[in-house]
């Protein structure tokens, strides 16, 4: 067996590992279910591991000593391991170490009132959002879904936004208005809504004043969090996470909305 016959599966495994690493944000943009647990990327890493292992097995067949002639293949094998280790560390450890929220409004508590500019720069208060006169489907208004998010360029955030937009008609039909709060300026939120086709409300909190009052701040941005408020401003459901990737799915939000009376 030639050296090339040993090296090609190892290098193929390396490139597949690279694809598995860099494709994660694109994967969960296309398939949001992979955002919470990257099963598709882990499958690619598994296939890459099989290719690398097959190449190494061929190199170390008894009596062949082909390992002396596959220096580049060994280098690729080591790089593949490093890539997987970095992926696992980033997705399963670092991304899941956001500080726990201890003072966020609890279920049954009244949410803190606030006033923030929307994507058009107009001031909007929580009281106004809860008012039937400003809530779509006013005759059946049941509340507001506050979605705290990071920033416009965040792929995980946009994955959540797309889910909300996809189910927006259902939210509105049940009398609940989704509202995103982030550190983006009104101009940035307006550009995002225009380019992505989002038709729900964005509120801007670049100073993190409201984000910190709700205890969902992480450094200089908001961590993922959702609060479902009834028309009295009382929290009826919330979702807090210590991961920058894991968020409530729209189906979970809709299930919570259905519990509102």
Predicted regions and their residues:
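Membrane-embedded alpha-helical segments of integral membrane proteins
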Residues: 6-58
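N-terminal "domain-start" segment that seeds a small globular fold
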Residues: 96-134
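Short active-site neighborhood of thiol/selenol oxidoreductases, capturing the structured segment around
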Residues: 126-164
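Short hydrophobic alpha-helix segments
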Residues: 127, 214, 237-239
């Amino acid at each position: 067996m030639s050296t090339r016959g040993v090296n090609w599966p190892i290098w193929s495994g390396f490139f597949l590992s690279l694809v598995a690493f860099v494709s994660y944000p694109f994967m969960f943009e296309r398939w949001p279910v992979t955002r919470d647990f990257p099963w598709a990327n882990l499958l690619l890493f598994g296939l890459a591991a099989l290719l690398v292992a097959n190449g190494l097995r061929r190199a170390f067949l008894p009596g062949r000593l082909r390992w002396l002639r596959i220096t580049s293949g060994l280098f690729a094998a080591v790089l593949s391991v490093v890539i997987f280790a970095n992926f696992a560390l980033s997705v399963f450890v670092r991304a899941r170490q956001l500080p726990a929220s201890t003072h966020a409004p609890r279920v049954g508590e009244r949410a803190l009132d606030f006033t923030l500019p929307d994507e058009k720069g107009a001031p909007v208060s929580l009281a106004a959002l809860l008012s039937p006169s400003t809530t779509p489907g006013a005759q059946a208004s049941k509340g507001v879904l506050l979605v705290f998010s990071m920033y416009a360029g965040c792929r995980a955030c946009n994955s959540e936004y797309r889910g909300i937009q996809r189910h927006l008609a259902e939210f509105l039909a049940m009398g609940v208005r989704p509202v995103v709060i982030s550190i983006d300026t009104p101009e940035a939120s307006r550009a995002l809504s225009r380019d992505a086709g989002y038709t729900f409300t964005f509120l801007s909190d670049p100073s993190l004043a409201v984000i910190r009052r709700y205890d969902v701040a992480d450094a200089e941005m908001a961590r993922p969090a959702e609060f479902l408020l009834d028309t009295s401003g009382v929290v009826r459901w919330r979702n807090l996470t210590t991961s920058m990737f894991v968020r409530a799915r729209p189906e979970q939000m809709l299930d919570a909305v259905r519990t509102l009376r």
